[in-house]
Amino acid sequence: MEAARKALAVVAVLGAGGGVGSILFALVTPGELQKQLMLQEMPERDSRRRDEAVRTKELVMATLKDAAATKENVAWRRNWTVRGDGRSA
């Protein structure tokens, strides 16, 4: 009988903890309007940020292409925008 009482107490405590956690989660999550505002403020929505990301990806891809075409270890370059032959990427 004592084991059943302890098991019931454990189940009650765990259930209460789960209930409190669920209620707190429901209180903290943003509403639909707040989600829309957060999405509008994301950095990817800014055209300057997008252009900068595209340029960075282009530089990385040019560096990888250059690294594949040469035996030089391009990872040790101080300036990745300049190729080994002195031209700009």
Swiss-Prot record:
InterPro entries registered for this protein in UniProt: UQCC3 (IPR027896)
Location of the protein in the cell: Mitochondrion inner membrane
Membrane topology category: Single-pass membrane protein
Record key words, sorted: ATP synthesis, Membrane, Mitochondrion, Mitochondrion inner membrane, Transmembrane, Transmembrane helix
Chain intervals for the UniProt region annotation (Mediates lipid-binding): 23-80
Segments passing through the bilayer: 8-28
Membrane-side (Mitochondrial matrix) residue stretches: 1-7
PTM field: Probably cleaved by OMA1 under mitochondrial stress conditions.
Signal peptide: none
Topological domain ranges for the Mitochondrial intermembrane compartment: 29-89
UniProt-listed GO biological process terms: ATP biosynthetic process; cristae formation; mitochondrial electron transport, ubiquinol to cytochrome c; mitochondrial respiratory chain complex III assembly
Keyword presence, Cell wall biogenesis/degradation: no
GO molecular function: cardiolipin binding; phosphatidic acid binding
Top-rank lineage group of the source organism: Eukaryota
GO cellular component, one term: mitochondrial inner membrane
Membership in a protein family: Belongs to the UQCC3 family.
Function: Required for the assembly of the ubiquinol-cytochrome c reductase complex (mitochondrial respiratory chain complex III or cytochrome b-c1 complex), mediating cytochrome b recruitment and probably stabilization within the complex. Thereby, plays an important role in ATP production by mitochondria. Cardiolipin-binding protein, it may also control the cardiolipin composition of mitochondria membranes and their morphology.
Description of how the protein assembles with itself and partners: Associates with the ubiquinol-cytochrome c reductase complex (mitochondrial respiratory chain complex III(CIII) or cytochrome b-c1 complex). Interacts with UQCC1. Forms a complex, named COMC, composed of UQCC1, UQCC2; UQCC3 and UQCC4; mediates MT-CYB hemylation and association with the first nuclear-encoded complex III subunit UQCRQ.
Protein name: Ubiquinol-cytochrome-c reductase complex assembly factor 3
The species this protein was found in: Rattus norvegicus (Rat)
Lineage, broadest ranks: Eukaryota, Metazoa, Chordata, Craniata, Vertebrata
Gene: Uqcc3
